[in-house]
């Protein structure tokens, strides 16, 4: 199964979504499952990959993402797989988890390289999909929405050059 990865440009936006997942999304899943007469998917809480959590919690979250799967044994021992992963730019590098196959990017990242790196975290082992939710009140997001196709057909030419670290040793 999959984990919904939600990418945010700021911790402020992530905090709002965390509250939304903990309250409204859980309630919606319960109501929908009852209406459809099916078992509901249990969401304990959203996991985070951000600078707000400690290194120990980050390691636990990554371990949970990589090792815990849905099974009767895990449910019986109250070990639940991660359903929702809220992340900031920390997810852009070094995260290679097979169960990350669905991503929602809330807003356009400031850098094209960040957009490419973050969106490429899904679909590493199995096919994945990334959705982008633009904010109509932000002119930058609106511009990317209006030029979505042309931007994606040639976005590698928009990648900004990175600066060299001063006093670093030659490669």
Regions found by a protein language model. Give the residues of each.
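Short secondary-structure boundary/capping segments
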Residues: 20-25, 65, 100-104, 119-122, ...
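A short beta-strand element within the Helicase C-terminal
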Residues: 91-107, 128-132
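Long, largely alpha-helical accessory region at the distal end of helicase-like NTP-driven motors
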Residues: 164-171
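Switch/connector loops and helix/strand junctions flanking conserved nucleotide-binding motifs
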Residues: 14-17, 56-58, 94-96, 112-114, ...
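Conserved C-terminal RecA-like helicase domain
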Residues: 2-85
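Conserved segment of the helicase C-terminal RecA-like domain
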Residues: 81, 117, 121-159
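Conserved P-loop NTPase motor core
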Residues: 107-117
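A short beta-strand-to-loop transition that corresponds to the Sensor-1 phosphate-sensing loop
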Residues: 8-11, 87-90, 134-136
